[in-house]
Amino acid sequence: MDFEAVIGLEVHAELSTNTKIYCGCTTEFGGQPNTHVCPICLGLPGSLPQLNKRVVEYGIKAGLALNCSINKVCRMDRKNYFYPDCPKNYQITQDEVPICRDGYIEIELENGEKKKIGIERIHMEEDAGKLLHTNAGTLVDYNRAGVPLIEIVSRPDIRTPEEATKYLEKLKSILSSIEVSDCKMEQGSLRCDGNISVMPKGSEKFGVRSEIKNMNSFKALEKALSYEYDRHVEAVTKGEILEQETRRWDEANSVTVLMRSKEKANDYRYFPEGDLVTLNISDEWIEEVRKTIPELPHEKAERFVNEFGIPKYDAMVLTLTMDMAKFFEETALKSEDAKAASNWLMGDISRLMNEKAIEVKDLKFNPEQLAQLIKLINAGTISNNIGKKVLDDMFKSGKNPKDIVEEKGLVQNNDEGAILEVVKNIIENNPQSIEDFKNGKKRALGFLVGLVMKETKGKANPQIVNKLVSEEANKM
């Protein structure tokens, strides 16, 4: 029997506000433990929350960008549970009347087809503190308690781990582009839980689901869902009874591990938050927020294809982050060579950033300098290979490419006469390569070209070298 997965994602995004959701404490990441706290976020007796208006604005903004309907009347609710990281023993969240409903994200599948993944709801809530486990015991840091979150709950429309990854990538790019969250997964400002079950292909009855936590990267998300899918299929095939449960992804052993049986909504005893009034959102406020939404990543990608003529794949990669998209667009305009700008950013520059674990905003050079490098190559002043060496230097020092070329004497040699002398000398000293070429071994020419480039320390124009080597070899 063939099975398919039924997957839904719950994504928590920390909002980029300066202060917490119900008090004036800073939301800055880090700091000494328990220094970004006050009686309100610690839940001390007599303290009363006051809703941060910017949190509501960001909730509306996210909803509009994700094609949601905005609930003009919504309220906050208490979610009751006892855990050391929750100082009040309840979390202020939204239950029956969230700020947003009924949205969607459109992803593109491997075959080029587009698929809509429904968004059931978006609700505002406060984050919990953080538990720090040591050999001596468990410590609690409440700096994160009260940091504003939105939780984005998808419908169970996802059918493969790959689709789940595409959904999360698209969601991340949208939230970061509208600047409601920095979406730094490594710092926990974007966290994802997955719900998965399996059912026979063609069936409409969902199986028993598991919730998976601790998926803090795209790679972890895909691996965890794949593992859990295989575990469910194996159990169902053997006739075993699956139970609804919460599991965590163990990255070190590439398995999911049981945490607890899955709670149901009534376990949390939701009821309205009496210390906060019902929230009324006017049409005028919604329209004000709508005007602040910039060009979204998929819109920008479509424009890049039409305006710059780059491939669709390039445009999608370049718009995953707005910093990369901006860097590309400025470079393309200044260099007048969009494809070269795309190639450098997606190739060597991305490789160097990955090696150093930095982002576009951390680069020491700017789009104008990259455009200058592209122009030097296009003008024949330096070769593409020399350009890569110049880029390495730019990456380390931030110097202008022209200055690097002049300081290191990297100007390309375009003198055919001088290059011809080197070519003749190389051919004369490598008769076996000429013999191989005559016997049909085309690679022999590549070997000779390599020797010429080595002799000229990479400064000879590769096009001229290829032409002269071919001409001279055919004369022999």
UniProtKB/Swiss-Prot annotation:
Cross-referenced InterPro entries: Asn/Gln-tRNA_amidoTrfase_suB/E (IPR017959), Asn/Gln-tRNA_Trfase_suB/E_cat (IPR006075), Asn/Gln_amidotransferase (IPR018027), Asn/Gln_tRNA_amidoTrase-B-like (IPR003789), GatB (IPR004413), GatB_C_1 (IPR042114), GatB_Yqey_C_2 (IPR023168), Gln-tRNA_amidoTrfase_suB_CS (IPR017958)
EC number: 6.3.5.-
GO terms (BP aspect): glutaminyl-tRNAGln biosynthesis via transamidation; translation
Gene3D superfamilies found in the cross-reference section: 1.10.10.410, GatB domain, N-terminal subdomain
Catalyses which reaction(s): L-glutamyl-tRNA(Gln) + L-glutamine + ATP + H2O = L-glutaminyl-tRNA(Gln) + L-glutamate + ADP + phosphate + H(+); L-aspartyl-tRNA(Asn) + L-glutamine + ATP + H2O = L-asparaginyl-tRNA(Asn) + L-glutamate + ADP + phosphate + 2 H(+)
Cross-referenced PROSITE patterns: GATB
MF-aspect GO terms: asparaginyl-tRNA synthase (glutamine-hydrolyzing) activity; ATP binding; glutaminyl-tRNA synthase (glutamine-hydrolyzing) activity
Subunit-level organization: Heterotrimer of A, B and C subunits.
HAMAP family: GatB
Protein name: Aspartyl/glutamyl-tRNA(Asn/Gln) amidotransferase subunit B
Originating species: Clostridium botulinum (strain Hall / ATCC 3502 / NCTC 13319 / Type A)
